[in-house]
Amino acid sequence: MSGFVIANLNIKNPDAYKEYVDKVVATIKKFGGEYLVRAGEYKVMEGEWKNPRTVVIKFPNYDKALEWYNSEEYKPVKPIRLANSDGNMIIIKGVTW
């Protein structure tokens, strides 16, 4: 069962955030992750969507997503995101039918 990282972000400093984008991809790939959504056009259909940037990353399983988030590889990259954006992030298990 896949694991997903879902983040909804407001980028406060786009120039500095670019460093995060450049560095995070290799860490995601190392743990078998792939981007499904990375910003892009959207339309809010119901409720409120607080931040303009949404990211969805798929990992082979839930544990791999957690392993990536807590990894030594992601550890030095994470503060760049935190310093240059506000928002929410979850790691969630996918379903199988």
Question: Residue locations for each model-derived region?
Answer:
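Short S/T/G/P-rich N-terminal loop/turn motif that feeds into the first structured element of a domain
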Residues: M1-T54, K58-N70, K93-W97
